[in-house]
């Protein structure tokens, strides 16, 4: 991409406290997917190799839902304090999305204030559902109302759907269930009226929106038919809602996927993401080269995906540009 100046909005990190919490819960994988090693030093080495200027770090699946309620607030605070410390040490190389102790709504509201007002993190990470409660559920209305008031940037990462059992098919959840769960979340966010009610949230979905680009018209028809919002949706409103989301291009580095995504949304809604360290390091450079060489993207469009769109979302990074 131009200038090899990528802003990577989909990158993950771990803290000692988070690793300890995973072990205490008996979790040694992400729904069958091995948990990789990570250090800031090794991440920066790879960023330099790949031409990534800044990574916005977040906790990946399984998020925090596995933690007992009594421990979740402290775990979220520890993770966010660690993220803020990394940013202080590497202000131009690192950004961060704050973890919230959901489904504890009061604790989450408190952590939003601390993370954005005190720690000055760049946004919030949420998950497609928390213990089976999908984003868009009325139980999370207070969270989205506050994020809307703040015009916050929110990155939504998928988790395994309720009832997932890897033994049924033999594949870890990230292989296919993650993109399906992103699609479910998008559908519920629109159908519940949350997108309509909270237009100021800047919400990024992972992996090119999952299966949404391919299923958009089918999903749209059924939101119009079964959507719970009042007044009812029109087909035009639903298609506009699809364009409201931002989409990272992680895992859409092949022609039919990117063509479908670009048919659904304009170029100013696309953001670069690597999914490091879960994505194999050997797969990241070819994915960068694919986006860089797409014939249907001109130089300005490539620059927008590389960093221009992200700089509009993250003023702290723009100040360092």
Question: Each predicted region: which residue ranges?
Answer:
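Mid-to-C-terminal alpha-helical segments outside catalytic/metal-binding sites
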Residues: 1-9, 14-54, 81-89, 110-114, ...
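Active-site gating/metal-coordination segments in enzymes
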Residues: 58-192, 320
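H/E-rich (His + Asp/Glu) clusters that bind or coordinate divalent metals
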Residues: 164, 171-190, 202-321
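Short glycine-enriched loops at secondary-structure junctions
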Residues: 11-13, 102, 158-162, 276-279
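Short, basic, glycine/proline-bearing loop/turn elements
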Residues: 25-31, 128-129, 239, 243-246
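Acidic-and-aromatic substrate-binding clefts and catalytic sites of carbohydrate-active enzymes
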Residues: 33-38, 64-65, 102-108, 131-138, ...
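Hydrophobic faces of well-ordered beta-strands that scaffold small-molecule active sites
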Residues: 7-11, 55-57, 95-98, 124-126, ...
């Amino acid at each position: 991409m131009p200038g090899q100046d990528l802003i990577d909005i989909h990158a993950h990190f771990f803290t000692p406290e988070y690793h300890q919490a995973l072990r205490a819960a008996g979790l040694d994988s992400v729904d069958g997917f091995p948990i990789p090693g990570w250090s800031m030093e090794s991440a920066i080495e790879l960023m330099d190799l790949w031409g990534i200027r800044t990574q916005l770090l977040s906790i990946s699946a399984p998020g925090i839902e596995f933690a007992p309620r009594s421990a979740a607030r402290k775990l979220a605070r520890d993770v966010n304090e660690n993220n803020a410390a990394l940013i202080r040490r590497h202000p131009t190389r690192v950004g961060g999305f704050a973890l919230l102790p959901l489904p504890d709504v009061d604790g989450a509201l408190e952590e939003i204030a601390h993370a954005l007002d005190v720690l000055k993190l760049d946004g919030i990470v949420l998950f497609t559902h928390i213990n089976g409660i999908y984003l868009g559920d009325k139980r999370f209305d207070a969270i989205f109302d506050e994020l809307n008031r703040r015009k916050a940037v929110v990155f939504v990462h998928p988790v395994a759907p309720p009832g997932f059992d890897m033994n049924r098919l033999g594949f870890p959840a990230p292989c296919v269930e993650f993109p399906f769960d992103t699609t479910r979340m998008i559908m519920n966010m629109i159908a519940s009226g949350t997108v309509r009610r909270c237009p100021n949230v800047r919400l990024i979905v992972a992996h090119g929106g999952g299966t949404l680009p391919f299923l958009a018209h089918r999903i749209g028809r059924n939101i119009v038919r079964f959507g719970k919002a009042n007044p009812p949706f029109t087909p035009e409103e639903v298609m506009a809602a699809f364009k409201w989301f931002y989409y990272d291009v992680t895992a859409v580095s092949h022609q039919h996927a990117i063509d479908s995504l670009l048919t659904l949304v304009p170029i100013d809604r696309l953001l670069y993401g690597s999914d490091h360290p879960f994505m194999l390091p050997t797969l990241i450079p070819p994915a960068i080269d694919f986006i860089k060489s797409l014939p249907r993207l001109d130089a300005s469009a490539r620059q927008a995906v590389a960093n221009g769109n992200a700089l509009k979302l993250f003023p702290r990074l723009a100040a360092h540009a």
